[in-house]
Amino acid sequence: MSQEQLVAVNELNENLGKVLIKIARDSIANKLGILKINLEDYLSSLNDPILNKKGLAFVTLETYYGNSTSLRGCIGYVEAVAPLKEIVSKAAIAAAFSDPRFPPLSKGEFDNIIIEVTVLTKPQEIDVENRWELPKKIKVGEDGLIVEYGILYSGLLLPQVPMEYCWDEETFLAETCIKAGLEPDCWLNNKVKIKKFQGIIFREEKPKSEKILIIKPSEVKCKKEEISLL
């Protein structure tokens, strides 16, 4: 699938970001029984031409504690298998109920989660003759990474992750290898594919907030904490 057929991140704005967040929250609410809608009809009623383009996206859920948050689920799609509006709906439901790291989201948690939608560009494999040159081909604060080895090993980290944990490029590569279930230095293996992508982040300021933040990965603040539950 060509890049032209995908939603480009520069096509998205605050209003569309609000719609994407609403799709995610309404999809979860419907699954919980808080809303009672026909999800297929609901999505069909959203006729924006940009949302009808195929797209790539991740939905992240965080539990809100007032001054801090903790990860509650994160699932996404890096294959353009459906329109962006459907991808966000599917990713939201999967993040809430199918992330193997967490139990399914409960009704009692629904009003206390922050929803974040990251829309991605198409991943591109990084081609280098010398694997030690890989860190120079990556920009922390701009790129996300995918590590693939055969059909059994795959790991992805979003562009905001290395910013949150103050990583340099080599650490970012190593952590993505670990996410794929491989050794930290797997990126030096010529048989391991390394892909990069970019993204734009739409995030609720607070749970169920009307105010949506548009965040560039480079604007994400370092938490200076050990990585947890990625």
UniProtKB/Swiss-Prot annotation:
Domain AMMECR1: 15-213
Top-level taxon: Archaea
PROSITE patterns per record: AMMECR1 (PS51112)
Pfam families noted in UniProt: AMMECR1
Family annotation (InterPro entries): AMMECR1 (IPR023473), AMMECR1_dom_sf (IPR036071), AMMECR1_domain (IPR002733), AMMECR1_N (IPR027485), AmmeMemoSam_A (IPR027623), Uncharacterised_MJ0810 (IPR023472)
NCBIfam families: AmmeMemoSam_A, TIGR00296 family protein
Name listed for the protein in its UniProt record: Protein STK_02290
Source organism (scientific name): Sulfurisphaera tokodaii (strain DSM 16993 / JCM 10545 / NBRC 100140 / 7)
